[in-house]
Design a protein with these regions (language model features):
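Active-site neighborhoods of metal-dependent hydrolases
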Residues: 1-17, 25, 29, 59-62, ...
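Divalent metal-coordination and catalytic microenvironments
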Residues: 4, 42, 104, 193, ...
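Acidic-and-aromatic substrate-binding clefts and catalytic sites of carbohydrate-active enzymes
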Residues: 17-20, 45-51, 78-81
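Alpha-helix-loop-beta-strand connector modules within alpha/beta enzyme cores
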Residues: 26-37, 41
Length: 367
């Protein structure tokens, strides 16, 4: 924390973080609060045990006193869509009691992660090499196939939440597998003549990676419900990538290019789901304050001049799941720390970015 961290983050559906128990997280977050740190979590479940996972986050916040945020709030899997209203009630009750609970979201009904999310944690214990080794064992493959088909598993089973037809393969390292980019796991399974479970295992082995995929898990109705909640900020859950060079050799989730323009265009201007003023607040000052960053996110004296100039009548996302590598349109100028980096839609070549440090930063004096 003295070196500038904003707080403690956890990704509790992934190994090795999913082996962490609540008491361990409380101890870590408690230490961060000594430096005004926050807690942010990719919940232990976004599906079958969503409500329990939200209660765990609320408990951690209650015991430690730390503000807590949920990474990309969602109810994953059709049978869990109804749970979103329950989650709203849990969070809003906690907020009313004085806890500082918030969440962020991206405005698409599909998630993106690796194929490790389709297999149980025990198969991945010990790291990647051990995982691949287990996938080559006939005994393990039979057991994994059975567990992957269990819709009521006690782990976050994206294989069943999305279904093979709802898992879009978007990125491989192995050149021989790139022909499958843009196809669903179901389609590749049919092409290869193996079950979807075995196909997933074989692709992990052949690519020697967790490789990327898009999972169609959520409902558009729930996306709209979340957009209307004033305590949910907007975030892409993606890196900033370019539509050129090595970046276009693999697929992507369209949120990497279009999330913010989609809020301003589709949901604010076109569908009137949120006012323009509120949309801007929830992608600027709200996330900045939630993260404990108090000199950014507003056009205000003594704040860093991070400014976007866009045409509200033209701004729109262009990226799709079929053709994700497309920039949004309608953004004319961008200033970062007062330096122009986009001029009439063209990059100036300037690189004025700065490291943003948390409230506990001691100027590197960590003795």
């Amino acid at each position: 924390m003295r070196e500038g961290a904003l707080g403690v983050g956890s990704s509790l559906i992934y190994t090795p973080a999913n082996f962490a128990e609540t008491d361990e997280l409380i101890a870590l977050v408690g230490a961060a609060t000594e430096y005004n740190g926050r807690y942010i979590s990719h919940l232990r479940s976004e599906a079958n045990k969503l409500e329990e996972a939200v209660l765990e986050l609320i408990k951690i916040s209650s015991i430690t006193g730390a503000p807590a945020e949920i990474y990309h709030l969602k109810a994953a899997g059709k049978k869990n869509w109804y749970k979103l209203e329950n989650v709203f009630n849990l969070i809003e009750t906690a907020k009313a009691s004085g806890l500082r609970i918030s969440a962020n979201m991206y405005t698409y009904a599909a998630a993106a992660t690796g194929l490790d999310a389709t297999m149980p944690p025990w198969s991945q214990e010990g790291g990647h090499d051990e995982w691949v080794k287990r996938l080559k064992s006939k005994k393990n493959r039979d057991l994994l196939s059975e567990e992957m088909l269990n819709a009521d598993s006690d782990w976050e089973n994206f294989f069943m939440q999305a279904g093979p037809e709802g898992i879009l393969l978007t990125g491989f390292k192995n050149p021989d597998l790139k022909k499958y980019i843009g196809k669903t796991l179901s389609e590749v399974s049919n092409l290869r003549g193996t079950s979807p479970q075995i196909t997933a295992m074989d692709l992990v082995i052949e690519d020697n990676s967790r490789f990327d995929a898009v999972f169609f898990l959520m409902s558009e109705e729930n996306v709209l419900k979340q957009i209307k909640k004033p305590w949910i900020s907007f975030g892409s859950d993606a890196g900033a990538i370019a539509n050129e060079g090595v970046f276009i050799e693999k697929g992507a989730h369209p949120r990497a290019y279009g999330n913010f323009a989609r809020v301003l265009g589709k949901y604010s201007r076109d569908e009137k789901a949120i006012s323009l003023t509120e949309a801007i607040r929830r992608m600027t000052s709200l996330p900045a304050s939630n993260a404990g960053i108090y000199d950014r996110g507003q056009l205000k004296k003594d704040y860093y001049a991070d400014i976007v100039v866009f045409d509200p009548e033209e701004i729109a996302d262009r990226a799709t799941f079929e053709k994700p590598h497309q920039y949004a349109v309608g953004v004319e100028h961008v200033f970062v720390n007062g330096i122009q980096v986009l001029n009439h839609g063209k990059h100036t070549g300037a690189l004025p970015g700065m490291v943003v440090r948390g409230p506990g930063w001691s100027g590197w004096d960590t003795e």
